[in-house]
């Protein structure tokens, strides 16, 4: 049976400042930790990325032509406050006013994120969100944006608090490149969630119009053998690290006893302790019912197997299938069933995981109000032929994920939109430019845009709300 989506459903495309804008030092923009980190550790930089800083009118015109009626944009904190605090950079403010005006001119609703992996260098080198001073700096930055950009109707505090802690302190592929420090992972998650809560409360108390929420990456975790209690436990612990800890903070305003039992076990095995304060929980509790929406970024699921050994994580950054490894002491290791498809970057393709995650939020956090799928898409080594890309694999991936969203809506979940990652090809943090996701192919030499086959398919779905 052909599935459909509601008439008012948003068919969006997603971007992020550092991955799309380029212009990393233009018009007074301050440095971010990624600038030097990429220079020192990788074979690419974010200059000029997709040159969105200059070419946003082209991308928004294409959006309008191809039925994309929502766009995720992030504000680069260091364009507004070059050092994260202090003097405001008027050119940065002007740029975003112009960008949002163009969005509205093209009837593409901007969903605006305040922080998408790009803390200003001056604050990042001072401990980033492990330093509690950063909470105050973030709230001040948020307040300025809420006041200044009243034309924005949808705000998101953070993009992917989970992968930030994970990338910075567990896998070590994000600056500062620390590995296997689980106490830092949880502390980073916690302090960022407190920052989120404080910003949401300020937004509501100040009476700003519009809506506010947060975007969490929520990869679904399954036991490799559902009949083996040790595998079930491994999946539960892995879920706490990546999902439950931050979801509890968002919607319970505290960490459930079961969550804290898991956290304490992980820290007992791996070392370290957390600094969780009374005022933190007061802030979390005050915001737990104020989130207007939850953004879910979903790309993949994982299967977990019990494992007794040392932590070892190998990141597959070059698309060499089968080269990744993930095992955490006291938690478990990832081991996928052989029949589940994977991308070249070892990302597991499992649309059912998105359905299960949406229904989990609905069941476990009934005070959620609505959900947007704020990122979902397929990273590919696209072949550019005849001025396009015949990306049938991407179409199939998106189609299957839209179908399970339709199922979730039928089963009572309030899902209001979908943002494909990414609108156009962008720079990928730890994979460079080979891993493409866009609806529009970008020739990074000339910065020309070319609609892929998926763009024409997406346009038809957006126009008809019929998934076929």
From Swiss-Prot:
Positions binding D-galactose 6-phosphate in this chain are 19, 116, 159-160, 297, 428-429, 435, 437
UniProt keywords (A-Z) are:
Glycosidase, Hydrolase
Q: List the disulfide bonds.
A: none
> What Enzyme Commission number does this protein have?
3.2.1.85
Q: Which GO molecular function terms does the record list?
A: 6-phospho-beta-galactosidase activity; beta-glucosidase activity
Family note: Belongs to the glycosyl hydrolase 1 family.
Q: What is this protein called?
A: 6-phospho-beta-galactosidase
Q: What is the source species?
A: Streptococcus pyogenes serotype M12 (strain MGAS2096)
